[in-house]
Amino acid sequence: MAKKTVAAKKRNVKVDAYGQAHIHSSFNNIIVSLANSEGQVISWSSAGKMGFRSSKKNTPYAAQMAAQDCAKVAYDLGLRKVKVFVKGPGNGRESAIRTIHGAGIEVTEIVDVTPLPHNGCRPPKKRRV
């Protein structure tokens, strides 16, 4: 006898006019998530979700497409102003912020929260091309 599958119940998130935008930009991908003022995620997108593969995921254009997809959903739900938190050393940080602003969501503040080691792990060796 087959087990019955139960669909996961969708969480109701209260959307305010003011929220947060988190942009995580690594060397391989970029992830954009828009949240309300409590930090509950309203919408998210990434370059991989938008159909970019391999090295094309870490381009400013891929970041622009991911931010546009994410911002459109959040704007339709009622998000109007965001405080942007940027993390990571990747390429598409500025283009993602510009795209969020261009989608009609006002950017009030930009904070860089990139983690910096106090001489922690050994970094990867330099590439020889």
From Swiss-Prot:
Signal peptide: none annotated. GO terms for biological process: translation. Gene3D superfamilies: Ribosomal protein S11. Keywords: Ribonucleoprotein, Ribosomal protein, RNA-binding, rRNA-binding. The keyword RNA-binding applies. It comes from the Bacteria. InterPro entries: Ribosomal_uS11, Ribosomal_uS11_bac-type, Ribosomal_uS11_CS, Ribosomal_uS11_sf. One of its GO terms (molecular function) is rRNA binding. The keyword Cytoplasm does not apply. One of its GO terms (cellular component) is ribosome. Located on the platform of the 30S subunit, it bridges several disparate RNA helices of the 16S rRNA. Forms part of the Shine-Dalgarno cleft in the 70S ribosome. Part of the 30S ribosomal subunit. Interacts with proteins S7 and S18. Binds to IF-3. HAMAP family: Ribosomal_uS11. NCBIfam families: PRK05309.1 (NF003698), uS11_bact (TIGR03632). Belongs to the universal ribosomal protein uS11 family. This is Small ribosomal subunit protein uS11. It comes from Parabacteroides distasonis (strain ATCC 8503 / DSM 20701 / CIP 104284 / JCM 5825 / NCTC 11152). The lineage of its organism: Bacteria, Pseudomonadati, Bacteroidota, Bacteroidia, Bacteroidales.
